[in-house]
Amino acid sequence: MAMANHRIDRVGMEIKREVNDILQKKVRDPRVQGVTITEVQMQGDLSLAKVYYTIMSDLASDNQKAQTGLEKATGTIKRELGKQLTMYKIPDLVFEKDNSIAYGNKIDQLLRDLDNKS
């Protein structure tokens, strides 16, 4: 069982690295410029990869554009992954905005505000 989990983690890390690379080198869509893949969570049977990303902008419109751009590029990304990875079947990709960094920044700001008041 531990071996299976190790493989799932390894595949997730590999997909994260490759998708970042593909976004930089192969996807020409301006909507995905500035997108960074932060984490990939694999389903146990490796059929689905949840791909979490961040974007430099805080604007909701930019976030929506990035999401749309990623969804449009999914076919290209999967095709490129197929060339790079030695897997029988490339998992389906679902892109989700990673809000953990923004959440962390908000907590930092709240702590600074508290610190300034004391």
Swiss-Prot record:
Gene Ontology CC annotations of this record: cytosol
GO molecular function: ribosomal small subunit binding
Highest taxon above the source species: Bacteria
Positions of disulphide bridges: none
Location, primary (coarse class): cytoplasm
Subcellular localization(s) per the UniProt record: Cytoplasm
InterPro entries found in the cross-reference section: KH_dom-like_a/b (IPR015946), RbfA (IPR000238), RbfA_dom_sf (IPR023799), Ribosome-bd_factorA_CS (IPR020053)
Gene Ontology biological process terms from the UniProt entry: maturation of SSU-rRNA
Keywords from the named record: Cytoplasm, Ribosome biogenesis
Task performed by this protein: One of several proteins that assist in the late maturation steps of the functional core of the 30S ribosomal subunit. Associates with free 30S ribosomal subunits (but not with 30S subunits that are part of 70S ribosomes or polysomes). Required for efficient processing of 16S rRNA. May interact with the 5'-terminal helix region of 16S rRNA.
PANTHER family, A to Z: RIBOSOME-BINDING FACTOR A, CHLOROPLASTIC-RELATED
Subunit structure: Monomer. Binds 30S ribosomal subunits, but not 50S ribosomal subunits or 70S ribosomes.
Similarity comment: Belongs to the RbfA family.
Name this protein carries in UniProt: Ribosome-binding factor A
